[in-house]
Curated annotation (Swiss-Prot):
Protein name stated in the entry: Elongation factor 3A
GO MF annotations, alphabetized: ATP binding; ATP hydrolysis activity; ribosome binding; rRNA binding; translation elongation factor activity
PANTHER family on file: ATP-BINDING TRANSPORT PROTEIN-RELATED, ELONGATION FACTOR 3A-RELATED
Basic residues bias locations: 1007-1031
Organism per entry: Saccharomyces cerevisiae (strain ATCC 204508 / S288c)
Start and end residues of each stretch annotated as Disordered: 974-1044
Major enzyme class: hydrolase
Reaction catalyzed: ATP + H2O = ADP + phosphate + H(+)
Length: 1044
């Protein structure tokens, strides 16, 4: 093919035939044209003249359909000639215009031709093709043309997915604008094209949110909820321009929301997204949308804390984007611009004789080079493959390759090189060798860090609470870590803390069998190897203690033939014997293990390597925990629980009437026994103990011995089968359960602040309202039928309303039902009026109405000013005492918190009412060593009593004085100093509370000043003054309180 006289003559004849073709022979002639153009090529020539005529034919209404049909046939040829391709792309604007033609046939042919061109063009030539489509859709007012272009863009995603991903920053604004078109057909097509385009966002973290992100573009009212959803998402994949292009429209609108909370949340996400950006050019195209919104919010938001967060995001954006002090937005790099690469090509060709007719081909080469730069393709052979066919159109192959290689070198000099991994000295089979980033919600945890694991090695992970240890484990298990091998390549099993409650009635054997890990015989053998008896294998999971549940989860993981075991605090629920068994198993099983543990002795006995969180990186240290501490001095804080900068503080408990010393018993249990319904013997029996404000008690014993059952009876979760349990009338007990998340699992979509407001909105703790000691059972109902003789009439108590001091105890105001015809068929009980209320001493009431008395006692305690105002500031201050930042308390949903942060929230909520006794069931389960050290110090300084169930002798050795050893259902106390009466020691004086007091509605209670006792002389003087006034005024005299 050439512009020689012979070729021109043939093409002119074909074009004449094409111009007068009818619908019947149009396809045949178009096919002849395509075959000729894509046939044998005469070297160094192009069909410039023919395509010029073809362009005129497309613009002519009479020949448009035929001309476009020829283009479609040319594009549909399997061997599209490089000499033809650049010229076809130049026809796209004219074809787009015809897609909006009034003639339906021309419309249809134009739409089909656009699809054919998109599918035929080299994907790396997208920078030559896409601008024609986006310019046409912006400039046209014809809705049919817009729909055809949108269909072509959707087809382009399939034809050139990787290349479209890089063009998303300029494509998304065009599609977004089209989604607001007034024509519903255009809206639908634009939404479909946007959905198709977002397939290029290869980011597992936001895949499920993409429909919501698209919906936000069409419906801005969805922005607040979507911002919340993204705030609780774990980001582990690299944030690319494609990811930012779909996220930034949401965030820019979030910055413009009326609600301060959404503006603030958007700023937090921007702040943390920017921290993941190492190349300023990635964020550069989006600075114009984010920077003005942040600046405006910083200047106008009234909330100082939200303004501070906005300023932090602003500083981060300026730093990452290289924004100057004058806030002038720097230019985006032009290295990948077609104009830049065209200039380079023209400079290299200036000494060559290149005819003007090849100008379009040269521009096409520049467009391909620009895309290769954007894709960071720097391989010489790749450039030869993509560009040589076009450059040899006007140069000999050798010359073309020489110039092309120089073009490549000039273009890629400043492209960042990918990460280099240092080889380990340790030999062995690699299971994993990857680089990735990790975030949790709006917090960046790891940024472009390396993880390399070998087969049959044992690794421990260390780091402060909230740094992302458990998040990393879950991300690995869920396949969300970039570069980590899939489950097919390397079976990775995450051993959970707890077994899902939905399996509580399933037998141990069936539970493992349902996982599809083998036959029942093989499962049974493995469970026996793990220490399970035949009886335990047959019992339901709910009957297992926490330690045995952990062993069951571990056994199931081993049965799955794991290559890597992920163990998150495996010793939490295990006693000493089972911990020793686990150490031996991990050291001999030959399975790679990654362990998170706050037990330094366990890490010493198991680990060969320690992986430490340092900054936003993972750093590996060879050796066990002791060796790690030697190499990393900063890790010495792990050795001593009290060696930490983190501080916890529990609120001071309120005054208890009648309790003059810290030794006086405020809880006392005598001859107590408890047996679960349906069991053959009591779980605990013959239990005697007492607790005071000075108690520091450790409850120890093997798994299943009855420790948690004993504490449940103490706190009122369970009622004893027999025996007596005395609790001071105003005593408040904070109980943090072994499975701490049980407190908050139904409130995951609330913020911590909202959860505390919900829990205490009535003044009472709603978490304790369903305790057994507050529920009226059949025995209580029968006892409450007791008949009292009041003023000679038989009465039953209808309600107890208030309380007042009576000698050394209390008496209670009761309303009654009056009995008529008692013992007869016509017996009835009639409500009496309030004037018939009477006061009954506590001793008489508790025999039959103890739970009603307890309710009044609780309300009286709250009415005396123990209630705290449920304001954001008060809640944030209280939670900060337990190590929770205001950012987390008021602006993060519970679902997005780490395990350690959730337990801190449970501690904060449990101590909101200033308890007198704090009961902790396995507090070492989820807190890291820093937090455990802070908890240890706070418990030492706490003014109330402390009871701890734990297997960790290290945690309790310097904290507790009294030990309750529970074994086989019996409790043996030691180290106790129980007293009868007040006991010795310093006296507790009731403090005049200087702080403001509030009732249950948050209203300030005015505290009256205590009256000064008058002397005898002052009393006589006042009496004389009263007598004088009475004499002067006569019957008009009315005395006042001030006169006495």
């Amino acid at each position: 093919m050439s512009d020689s006289q012979q070729s021109i003559k043939v093409l002119e004849e074909l074009f004449q035939k094409l111009s007068v073709a009818t619908a019947d022979n149009r396809h045949e002639i178009a096919s002849e044209v395509a075959s000729f153009l894509n046939g044998n090529i005469i070297e160094h020539d192009v069909p410039e003249h023919f395509f010029g005529e073809l362009a005129k034919g497309i613009k002519d209404k009479k020949t448009a359909a035929n001309a476009m049909q020829a283009v479609a046939h040319i594009a549909n040829q399997s061997n599209l000639s490089p000499s033809v391709e650049p010229y076809i792309v130049q026809l796209v604007p004219a074809i787009c215009t015809n897609a909006g033609n009034k003639d339906k046939e021309i419309q249809s042919v134009a739409s089909e031709t656009l699809i054919s061109i998109v599918n035929a063009v080299n994907p790396v030539a997208i920078k030559a093709l896409l601008p024609h489509l986006t310019n046409a859709i912006v400039e046209t007012n014809k809705w049919q043309e817009k729909i055809a272009i949108l269909a072509a863009i959707s087809a382009m995603v399939d034809a050139a997915k990787d290349q479209v991903a890089l063009r998303m920053p300029e494509l998304i604004p065009v599609l977004s604008e089209t989604m607001w078109d007034t024509k519903k057909e255009v809206k639908a097509a634009a939404t479909a094209a946007m959905t198709k385009a977002t397939e290029t966002v290869d980011n597992k973290d936001i895949e499920r949110f993409i429909p919501s992100l698209i919906q936000c573009i069409a419906d801005p009212t969805e922005v607040p909820e979507t911002v919340h959803l993204l705030g609780a998402t774990t980001f582990v994949a690299e944030v690319t321009p494609a990811t930012l292009s779909i996220m930034v429209p949401l965030l820019s609108r979030g910055l413009n929301e009326r609600e301060t909370g959404i503006k603030r949340k958007s700023a937090v996400i921007i702040d943390n997204m920017c921290k993941l950006v190492e190349d300023p050019q990635v964020i550069a195209p989006f600075l114009g949308k984010l920077l003005p919104g942040l600046k405006s919010n910083f200047a106008t938001i009234a909330d100082p804390e939200a303004r501070e967060v906005t300023l932090r995001a602003l500083k981060t954006l300026r730093r990452v984007g290289n924004v100057g002090e004058d806030d002038a937005i720097p230019e985006v790099s032009h290295a990948g611009d077609v104009s830049t690469t065209l200039q380079v090509v023209n400079e290299l060709l200036k000494d060559e004789t290149v005819a003007p007719r090849f100008k379009i081909v040269v521009e096409y080469i520049a467009a391909i080079g620009a895309d290769l730069i954007d894709e960071r393709i720097i391989d010489q052979q790749a450039w030869f493959t993509h560009i040589t066919p076009y450059m040899t159109i006007f140069l000999h192959e050798k010359k073309a390759k020489d110039i092309l290689d120089e073009f490549r070198k000039r273009a890629v000099d400043n492209i960042p090189v990918g990460p280099n991994f240092d080889d380990e000295e340790d030999e062995g089979e690699d299971l994993c060798n990857c680089e990735f980033s990790l975030a949790y919600g709006a917090k960046i945890l790891l940024n472009k860090t390396q993880l390399r694991l070998k087969r049959a090695r044992r690794y421990g992970i260390c780091g402060p609470n909230g740094c992302g240890k458990s998040t990393l484990m879950r991300a690995i298990a869920n396949g969300q870590v970039d570069g980590f091998p899939t489950q097919e390549e390397c079976r990775t099993v995450y051993v959970e803390h707890d077994i899902d409650g939905t399996h509580s009635d399933t037998s141990v054997l069936d539970f493992v069998f349902e996982s599809g890990v083998g036959t029942k015989e093989a499962i049974k053998d493995k469970l026996i190897e793990f220490g399970f008896t035949d009886e335990m294998i047959a019992m339901p999971i709910s009957a297992l203690s926490g330690g045995w549940k952990m062993k069951l989860a571990l056994a199931r993981a081993v049965l799955r033939n794991a290559d890597i075991l992920l163990l998150d605090e495996p010793t939490n629920h295990l006693d000493t014997v089972n911990v020793a068994w686990l150490v031996n198993y991990l050291n001999t099983c030959g399975i790679t293990s990654i362990t998170i543990s706050h037990d330094s002795v366990f890490l010493d006995n198991v680990c060969e390597y320690i992986i430490n969180y340092e900054g936003l990186k993972l750093r590996k240290y060879k050796g066990n925990f002791t060796e790690f501490v030697k190499k990393c001095p900063a890790a010495k804080a792990y050795e001593e629980l009290s060696n930490t900068d983190l501080e916890f503080k529990f609120p001071e408990p309120g005054y208890l009437e009648g309790v003059k010393t810290k030794q006086k018993a405020i809880v006392k249990v005598t001859n107590m026994e408890f047996q679960y319904p349906g069991t053959s013997k009591p779980q605990i029996t013959d239990i005697n103990f007492q607790c005071s404000l000075s108690s520091r008690i450790a409850v120890i014993g093997p798994n299943g011995a009855g420790k948690s059952t004993l504490i449940n009876v103490l706190t009122g979760e369970l009622l004893p089968t027999s025996g007596e349990v005395y609790t001071h009338e105003n005593c408040r007990i904070a109980y943090i359960k072994q499975h701490a998340f049980a407190h908050i699992e139904s409130h995951l979509d609330k913020t911590p602040s909202e959860y505390i407001q919900w829990r205490f909105q009535t003044g009472e703790d709603r978490e304790t309202m369903d305790r057994a000691n507050r529920q009226i059972n059949e025995n209580d109902a029968e006892a409450m039928n007791k008949i009292f003789k009041i003023e000679g009439t038989p009465r039953r108590i209808a309600g107890i309303h208030s309380r007042r001091k009576f000698k050394n105890t209390y008496e209670y105001e009761c309303s009654f039902l009056l009995g008529e015809n008692i013992g007869m068929k016509s017996e009835r009980w009639v409500p009496m009026m309030s004037v018939d209320n009477a006061w009954i001493p506590r001793g008489e009431l508790v025999e039959s109405h103890s739970k009603m008395v307890a309710e009044v006692d609780m309300k009286e305690a709250l009415a005396s000013g123990q209630f705290r105002p449920l304001t954001r500031k008060e809640i944030e201050e209280h939670c900060s005492m337990l190590g929770l930042d205001p950012e987390i308390v008021s602006h993060s949903r519970i679902r997005g918190l780490s395990g350690g942060q959730k337990v801190k929230l449970v501690l904060a909520a449990g101590t909101w009412q200033r308890p007198h006794l704090i009961v902790l069931d396995e507090p070492t389960n989820y807190l890291d060593r820093d937090s455990l050290g802070a908890l240890s110090k706070a418990l030492k300084e706490f003014e109330g009593g402390v009871i701890i169930i734990t297997h960790s002798a290290e945690f309790t050795k310097n904290l507790t004085e009294e030990v309750w050893a529970v074994k086989d259902g019996r409790m043996t106390p030691s180290g106790h100093n129980w007293v009868s009466g007040q006991g010795a020691g310093p006296r507790i004086e009731k403090k005049e509370d200087e702080e403001d007091k509030f009732d249950a509605m948050g209203n300030k209670i005015a505290g009256g000043k205590k009256k000064k006792k008058l002397s005898s002389a002052e009393l006589r003087k006042k009496k004389k003054e009263r007598m004088k006034k009475k004499k002067e005024l006569g019957d008009a005299y009315v005395s006042s309180d001030e006169e006495f």
